[in-house]
Regions:
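Conserved thiamine diphosphate
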Residues: 1-108
Length: 108
């Protein structure tokens, strides 16, 4: 818990003079028939963390994009990854890249 308390406040305690680029990714949620101790949801707790950005993707493509964005963010980011999402297959295309091989080769 100290990580969450300290990291969220450090950037603002220093007057924004230094970045705190931390990404914490954790499984979240129920719906996969987990037992009592494996079906916790942290959304309400996480929403009260000062200084943290909280994201939760709804599909595999969103998870990919949110992770890339979280890594580049100078603030601490908590990625709550729904457990049911871990069982989905994502698209084979990378967001922002053309599907046509000829167009991709012209870009390179």
């Amino acid at each position: 818990l100290d990580l969450f308390k300290v990291a969220g406040n450090q950037r603002w305690a220093g007057g924004g003079t230094f970045d705190m680029p931390i990404v914490v990714m954790t499984p979240n949620g129920a719906g996969i028939r987990g037992s009592l101790y494996h079906s916790h949801s942290f959304e309400s707790w996480a929403s009260r963390l000062p200084g943290w950005k909280i994201v939760m993707p709804s599909n595999a493509l969103d998870a990919y994009g949110l992770m890339l964005t979280a890594i580049k963010d100078p603030n601490p980011v908590l990625v709550l990854l729904p457990k049911a999402l871990l069982r989905q297959k994502g698209a084979r295309l990378i967001p922002g890249e053309p599907a046509d091989a000829d167009e991709l080769s012209r870009m390179i």
